[in-house]
Amino acid sequence: MNFFIKSCFLDKEKTDCIVVSVFELSELSDSAIYLDKCSNGHITSLIKLGDIQGKIGDTLMLYKVPKILSKRILLVGCGKKDEINIIRFKKILKNTIHAIKKKSIKNIVYSFSNINIDNIYWMIRRMVLSLKESLYETIKINNTNIKNTNIHSITLNIIKKNDLFIAKTALKHALAIDHAITSTKNLSNLPPNICNPLYLSYKAQELSKKYENNIVVEIIDIKKMKELGMNAYIAVGNGSKNKPFMSVIKYSGNNIVNKKIIAFVGKGLTFDSGGISIKPALHMHEMKYDMCGAAAVYGTLIMAAELQLPLTVIGILSGCENMVGSHSFRPGDVLTTMSGQTVEILNTDAEGRLVLCDSLTYLERFSPDIVIDVATLTGACVTALGESVSGLFSNNEELSNQLLHASQETDDKIWSLPLFSEYHKELNSNIADFSNIGRGKAGAITAACFLSKFTKKYNWAHLDIAGTAWKSGKKSGATGRPVELLCQFLLNQSNYIYN
């Protein structure tokens, strides 16, 4: 499916369907008014019949409108003009796709005027990403009857010709971000018998082939991990026949404008049984999503390469599998991490932080200025923030504010939580430097406190996406979060101007 940007006369467009907005009390948008005048009031006469009120959720398909070359016009209700926000706008777009999917419509022109949710850049970007999200379908394994959408092209009509350049920039960014989100979803949704740590390393190596001028990949296998002293990482994978692999993706842009080295680390537990501290059977199948952090980092690096961002970005996919076996690590073990710090294991289901701590230490060799780890780390974060908001922790206020700003821009909600010294005390151990879980409450915070002990040499932030990375139930599947937020963070670091 292709997207296009242009400024056109709607009555002259030979297309299958033109989509225009109608507000409450049957108030027409400027685009609808233009088509109404061209058709000698045909649209107004039909609206007077009362088939559409302009409320959000309303749609009305018109056929063979006089003096209009398009085969159809879809009127879509947008509610009250001054009450449209990002959430309602996404719902409006979803309603249009729902109405169009029922028809054999291949080519569409959207002409949304009088919707002032933001400047033209953000309006176009939100439109493209929302439409793409509405059209996304999970790939079924070995399904020969894949039903793709009938839609071949979507054209976004720009009312003011002066806005064409920025609109085309928005489209370029949106398509790259969608590529990142879709790649993240597709990888996250794979079953664990396909997507194991070795498979993650293959996916990383594919990037170095596709973007050979900008991306170099190094794979750290268990032999190299042993040489590096990554004992915590290794211990987590000891119970599985699928050995751990850490994929290091190095992206170097052309004409770099920001000299900072930015690094992302993604938790890549391709399946987490909990180990000896085994999880309950109910919902254990969803633990294939415990690698969504790594998938998000993978997707974000794709966007950087697609847009040729003028940055240096490192992405680590910390691939591992936590299984029960005769070689599994145990509660009571004491592990010496790559940093030299020792950890008492109180719970083998608190394994993600053990993989991440050695990955965070490994990153020191690159002298990064910014490190952001992304992990489905704790159920406690889901308890605290629910399934709509990710947890944010950081040792640097400026970095925290930059991520919060990107969150507001993308409507990918995050919430900052503290790392007070009182929480660190919960990790005290009598036999090691600290334990791998807290002995009290605030599990999301104590997990972040654990990670912070390995991030003293750079500015660091931790995103706990345990509640937001996937959805359960009838419409289960990966959400692709927080990829757009991370992409926006990189765009902001690239000093892009959107107005």
Curated annotation (Swiss-Prot):
Class of the enzyme per the UniProt entry, highest EC level: hydrolase
GO cellular component: cytoplasm
Organism: Buchnera aphidicola subsp. Acyrthosiphon pisum (strain Tuc7)
Gene that this polypeptide is encoded by: pepA
Cofactor: Mn(2+)
Gene3D superfamilies: Leucine Aminopeptidase, subunit E, domain 1, Zn peptidases
BP GO annotations: proteolysis
Pfam families: Peptidase_M17, Peptidase_M17_N
Name used for this protein in its record: Probable cytosol aminopeptidase
Cofactor note: Binds 2 manganese ions per subunit.
